[in-house]
C-alpha cells in the first residue's frame, strides 16, 4: 500500500488520489514534488554519508516549507551530536530518526511511515514516537503502518485495519481499543482459514 501510494510499485487495482487528483500514473519523483514522502521499512540510509549529508540528499527534492536540517534537529535533538558522523555508526533508533528526518526534508504534505518501531530497542522507540508526536502536532499528515498497536493508537487520529488488501475495521483512534483491532484482524484471518473467527 505505502509503495503504491509513493509510486514505487503500481497498484494491482484501483487508483491513487491526492487531494482528489488521480496520481496513479505519475512516477515516484513527481509524487515527491507533489508532497508525498515515503520512509520505508528498514531505513535505507546511505551508510557512508554523515547524518547531515543523508538529510541534505532529500533537500534536492524539497518544496518550500519549514523543514530543513535545523528543524529536523529540533524535533530529533539526540541527532545533534551525531550530525557529522557516518550513518553506519548510528544506533537503530538514531538511523530511524535520520530516515524520518530525510522524509521531512522534502517538506511533504503526506509522510508515509512504514514500521517506525521495527527492530528498535524500547528506549529508541520511545524517542522516535515522542518526536513523531511533535511532527503530527505541527500539522503534518502521517500515514503510519505499525504493528505496535499501543504506540500507534497514542499518535493516531484515525485507524484503518487492513487484512489482505481489505479494510476490516476503521474509525477514530479514541473510539477503538487494542482488543477490538486485534479481534478484527485475527478474527477475520481465522474465519478466512476455516476457523471459528468473528
Where are these regions (language model features)?
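Glycine-rich phosphate-binding loops of nucleotide-dependent enzymes
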Residues: 1-198
Amino acid at each position: 500500500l505505502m509503495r503504491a501510494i509513493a509510486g514505487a510499485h503500481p497498484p494491482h487495482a484501483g487508483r491513487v488520489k491526492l487531494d482528489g487528483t488521480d496520481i496513479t500514473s505519475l512516477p515516484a519523483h513527481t509524487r515527491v514534488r507533489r508532497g508525498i514522502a515515503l520512509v520505508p521499512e528498514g531505513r535505507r540510509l546511505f551508510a557512508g554519508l554523515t547524518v547531515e549529508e543523508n538529510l541534505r540528499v532529500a533537500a534536492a527534492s524539497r518544496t518550500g516549507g519549514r523543514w530543513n536540517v535545523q528543524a529536523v534537529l529540533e524535533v530529533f535533538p539526540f541527532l545533534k551530536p551525531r550530525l557529522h558522523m557516518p550513518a553506519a555508526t548510528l544506533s537503530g533508533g538514531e538511523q530511524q530518526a535520520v530516515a524520518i528526518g530525510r522524509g521531512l526534508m522534502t517538506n511533504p504534505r503526506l509522510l508515509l511511515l512504514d514500521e517506525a518501531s521495527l527492530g528498535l530497542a524500547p528506549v529508541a522507540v520511545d524517542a522516535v514516537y515522542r518526536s513523531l508526536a511533535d511532527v503530527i502536532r505541527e500539522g503534518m499528515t502521517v500515514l503510519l503502518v505499525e504493528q505496535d498497536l499501543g504506540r500507534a493508537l497514542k499518535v493516531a487520529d484515525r485507524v484503518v485495519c487492513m487484512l489482505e488488501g481489505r479494510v476490516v475495521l476503521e474509525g477514530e483512534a479514541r473510539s477503538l481499543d487494542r482488543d477490538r483491532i486485534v479481534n478484527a484482524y485475527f478474527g477475520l484471518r481465522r474465519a478466512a482459514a476455516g476457523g471459528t473467527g468473528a
